[in-house]
Every structure is written in C-alpha cells, then in structure tokens.
Amino acid sequence: LKDAHPGSTVTILTMGPGRAADIIREGLFRGADNGYLLTDRAFAGADTLATSYALATAIRKIGDCDIIIGGRQAIDGDTAQVGPQVAEKLGLTQITYAEEILEVGKDKITVKRHIDGGVETVEGPLPIVITVNGSAAPCRPRNAKLVQKYKHAKTVTEKQQGNLDYTDLYDKRDYLNLVEWSVADVNGDLAQCGLSGSPTKVKAIQNIVFQ
C-alpha cells in the first residue's frame, strides 16, 4: 500500500508490556514510518471490550487514519472480537477476514475476503477498519538498511533500564525514540481499562494434554 501510494504513512500501534516494543521495531524493519506502544499496568487483565476501548482511544489520539489494519484474532483468546469492537467504537465501517487489498481509491477500498467455501470481493468507504485472515500473503521481509537504521530504537523505559552508553544518539536521531503511552497519555477512563473495564471473568483454567 505504501509503495502504491507515495506520501502515505504507516504507523504501528500495539498494546502490551514493555517487551511489546519488539513488535514496533519489527514493523520499522519492514517499512513502517513510526510506532506507538500503549503500555500501563492499568491495561493488565483486559478482555476484548477493554482492549478495544484502549486501542480506539489511542487511535483517536494519533489522529486521522484512512485504513486501520489489524489481525483477525489473537492466539490466546481466539475470539476475533477486538477488530470489530474498535470499528464500532470509532464509528467506522469494517471488513473482516480480508485476504488481499485489491484497490484503494480516493474514498473507497476494494478487498478480497475469505468466506466459507470461497472468497468474495467487497467495497467499503474510507476510513475503514480491516482485519486480516491468516490465509493472506505474508508481510514484506525485513529490509537490511532499515534494520541498521532502527536496531537501536528504544522506548523511554527501555533506555532507563538499559544503562545505555550512547544516550547522545537519541538526542541526535529522534526517530530512534519510540513513543510509549499510558492511560493518562491517551486521556483514557480507568474504569474502562484492564480488569475494571472487563465484564468477562475467567472462572477456571484447565490444561488439556492430547496423548
């Protein structure tokens, strides 16, 4: 998309603990322009409702977006609810189970999506939320030049914990400073974040071992 639309910007947004900064670096290695890490103890224990609230709040802070792309579902809860809930909270159209973006026009997008028994081609207005199916083509590989450019990119927390001996590097090269946001930074409501904002409660966990 970025190559086909000169002047466009790709922004990475992820929510998680400090180590989730690795996801942002990986995106930068593959051609993204910038990234934001949504991290705060107050986000811990979030179900899909609280997760989608936090992400939608951060997206509003980032500003105008034409296309918001996310995975279909996480590998733990496996519910596929966060993407649609983000779309609902932002008041945007959504296309789920996307396999390929066929065309992006001035005010609409054409997408091929996976359905039971085949595929279908659909159109949607911009801005839009798209969740990508596992059958989509793999993302672009790492770019060696970008790996060299961003390999020292760090969040404030990482720099504080790392006892780095090249801190002046971050003053000279602002693109190496990864942004991390707390609940307060995105003007979030604590009552809607983490366990406080999660109506889903885990009653029990059982390990199942297949013989």
Model-found features: residue ranges?
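N-terminal glycine-rich FAD/FM-binding segment characteristic of electron-transfer flavoproteins
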Residues: 1-211
